[in-house]
Amino acid sequence: MEDISEIFDIYAICACCKVLNSNEKAGCFSNKTFKGLGNEGGLPWKCNSVDMKHFSSVTSYVNETNYMRLKWKRDRYMEKNNVKLNTDGIPSVDKLQNIVVMGKASWESIPSKFKPLQNRINIILSRTLKKEDLAKEYNNVIIINSVDDLFPILKCIKYYKCFIIGGASVYKEFLDRNLIKKIYFTRINNAYTCDVLFPDINEDLFKITSISDVYSSNNTTLDFVIYSKTKEIHEEINPNDELFNNTFLGVCDEKNTNFDDEDDYTYFSFNKHKDNIKKNSEHAHHFKIYNSIKYKHHPEYQYLNIIYDIIMHGNKQDDRTGVGVLSKFGYMMKFNLSEYFPLLTTKKLFVRGIIEELLWFIRGETNGNTLLEKNVRIWEANGTREFLDNRKLFHREVNDLGPIYGFQWRHFGAEYTDMHADYKDKGVDQLKNIINLIKNDPTCRRIILCAWNVKDLDQMALPPCHILCQFYVFDGKLSCIMYQRSCDLGLGVPFNIASYSIFTYMIAQVCNLQPAEFIHVLGNAHVYNNHVESLKVQLNRTPYPFPTLKLNPEIKNIEDFTISDFTVQNYVHHDKISMDMAA
């Protein structure tokens, strides 16, 4: 037997609170905790603007493209069942809208200034209310005497979806007769006096399938859940799917698109303020190629998407360098090192420089001249006389960068004098310790390498940006997670992704493991103002397949690696993009 609620797209939408002085045992909660629907002919709570915005968004939203498919479904049903249409007394509707069905009490509870509910077809279900009882301005409101009177209207009228909006007896009849496809349910997280309760939801028939963000309004928190009939719930969900937890399953299935899921995704986006969606709208027209890519599953898009988000939605701030930035806080990227080496392809990167700097860190060096002699200029601007003097390091020799990364990795806690001193056996050799733990205590949760030494920060030419990494061993594979406090998306982050990936490959090899994942956590992520135009160019480039990285398999000691022990194979890339460093 066909489900009428499915054919004619009938839904319920409601908001319920906790009931003051209910008999529910203290501390024992369930889905039935939220059941308070009304009190003394109105809502139990004062106006909740977030819930009202959600209600309006859900019941007003229509999708013209999806409507044609919904109409085809309904027409097919009526043709199959030889349904004869009778349009007598049913008003014609040209504009596509949703239907809202309510009882007499619910209609009367709506403030006059909001009657009838705009951009919706208002239907009142009442055995006593007559058309002549309504004011002339409500001439387009439809009155029906029973639930059965609704179906001739649904068969004839142009509409997108039909929402049952109250009250309790109306909800109950539609639920009892199995005429509800989904329930859009607001949970108002506060207790109020209630004299009307929402009817019990049959949890064998309906299950919660979606839960929104949590909001605050009128001194209470609230969220929105969607109850779906159990037959419509996806039986198999792959938690490893890239879109799991972020996108409704039906959205990305071109062959079996679930229009309800598309709409639900839109409903849950109701509270995204328009001024935030295009915060930096002056840049919007520069991303034609980037926006033309429908599915951005290539792992490089993790990086590119962050840049796009910051350019479009970032906060405009002044910064230490005086250049100014667009910034946001908190991102994560994850790269599968067992499949590829994440060396960005949308611009050519200086691979040799990345490796030389990493080897320099591993040796515990702080002398910038060592890198300059190899024509690696990553630290050049931070070692100048002017830069060191600005850091109040007047006594420091040019290119003496102080107790930065490598010093902390190999000599944490040692007293720093200058770049020429011998620090052998001084301080804590963190790198040696983590390799020892990986080899001998691989399940340890303390395999951490930290460059953030508060005592030494003022002595450093530049306090560390990538400050901490942790390693994880499982099934013969090594993963690394790194936290970066300050993230220069244009210049620094591409190097950091590659550097810590190489570092993970190296440690995996000397510990007789295989590389697994590199996870990159970004704190203050920013785009310098003088990098924006260059990054627009980069975002409109399409990534190529990542290359692979091969290490000399004979190397078993982390300190024995040299530049000749690294081979990057099949690095296909776009041209170099120049950006000035903000120092």
Curated annotation (Swiss-Prot):
This is Bifunctional dihydrofolate reductase-thymidylate synthase. InterPro entries: DHFR-like_dom_sf (IPR024072), DHFR-TS (IPR012262), DHFR_CS (IPR017925), DHFR_dom (IPR001796), Thymidate_synth/dCMP_Mease (IPR045097), Thymidate_synth/dCMP_Mease_dom (IPR023451), Thymidate_synth/dCMP_Mease_sf (IPR036926), Thymidylate_synthase (IPR000398). DUMP binds at R320, H466, Q484, R485, S486, C487, D488, N496, H526, V527, Y528. NADP(+) binds at residues 36-42, 104-106, 125-128, 166-173. It comes from the Eukaryota. Substrate binds at D51, I165, Y171, T186. It catalyses: (6S)-5,6,7,8-tetrahydrofolate + NADP(+) = 7,8-dihydrofolate + NADPH + H(+); dUMP + (6R)-5,10-methylene-5,6,7,8-tetrahydrofolate = 7,8-dihydrofolate + dTMP. Bifunctional enzyme. Involved in de novo dTMP biosynthesis. Key enzyme in folate metabolism. Catalyzes an essential reaction for de novo glycine and purine synthesis, DNA precursor synthesis, and for the conversion of dUMP to dTMP. In the N-terminal section; belongs to the dihydrofolate reductase family. In the C-terminal section; belongs to the thymidylate synthase family. The active site is at C465. The lineage of its organism: Eukaryota, Sar, Alveolata, Apicomplexa, Aconoidasida. GO terms for cellular component: cytosol; mitochondrion. Keywords: Methyltransferase, Multifunctional enzyme, NADP, Nucleotide biosynthesis, One-carbon metabolism, Oxidoreductase, Transferase. GO terms for biological process: dTMP biosynthetic process; methylation; one-carbon metabolic process; tetrahydrofolate biosynthetic process. CDD domains: DHFR, TS_Pyrimidine_HMase. Homodimer.
